[in-house]
Every structure is written in C-alpha cells, then in structure tokens.
C-alpha cells in the first residue's frame, strides 16, 4: 500500500474507491494499491 498525495490509475484494471472519506485504488496487481493521505 502506497500512501500518496495524489492517487491515480496506473493500469486499466485499477479501480478508484472512496472508503471512510479516503480515496483508495484497488487492483488485481498488488503493487498498484494506493491510498490518499
């Protein structure tokens, strides 16, 4: 899980989701997991 100021989709399988007021990227590739902090 990378914590970044700006999250973006890295590949076409990445999904942007809002959870508990945070924007999270989930993907089938675990390296693409990101959270906005």
UniProtKB/Swiss-Prot annotation:
Metal-binding listed as a keyword: no
MF (Gene Ontology): structural constituent of ribosome
UniProt xrefs under InterPro entries: Ribosomal_bL36, Ribosomal_bL36_sp
Localization terms from the record: Plastid, Chloroplast
UniProt-listed Pfam families: Ribosomal_L36
Range of residues in the leader sequence: none
GO biological process, alphabetically ordered: translation
Keyword Cell cycle in record: no
Record's keyword terms, sorted: Chloroplast, Plastid, Ribonucleoprotein, Ribosomal protein
Cited PROSITE patterns: RIBOSOMAL_L36
GO cellular component terms, A-Z: chloroplast; ribonucleoprotein complex; ribosome
PANTHER family named among the record's database cross-references: 50S RIBOSOMAL PROTEIN L36, CHLOROPLASTIC, LARGE RIBOSOMAL SUBUNIT PROTEIN BL36C
Family of the protein in this entry: Belongs to the bacterial ribosomal protein bL36 family.
Protein name from the UniProt record: Large ribosomal subunit protein bL36c
The gene coding this protein: rpl36
């Amino acid at each position: 899980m990378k914590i970044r100021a700006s999250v973006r989709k890295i590949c076409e399988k990445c999904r942007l989701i809002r959870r508990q007021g945070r924007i999270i990227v989930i993907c089938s590739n675990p390296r693409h997991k990101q959270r906005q902090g």
